[in-house]
Amino acid sequence: MKYDLIISGEIGVKYDWWTGRQGTTADMVRSFLTKNEGKEVNIAVSSPGGSVADGLEIYQAIKDHGKCNMYIIGMTASAATFLCMGAKSVNMVVAPHVG
């Protein structure tokens, strides 16, 4: 499966200087969806969660776009779970960890 966007790392954090990991912010997702307005997109999610505020913004952006298919590909918890609820479809690979 080819994913157009992967939501990973901590939600609401662009870059975690402590761990050196990149996260995903609402601005990043909105920018991607704006560039792909009117197109059907496949978005993968593997995130421990994070900011509720950013998660809600991402949820709304995905819902407003209307053509997002979400794929849970790894651990998806907390804020990363409810942002998927705005999608056209939500799919899980074999043995994902949703919490």
Task: Describe the role of every protein-language-model region.
Residues 1-99:
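Terminal-region recognition feature
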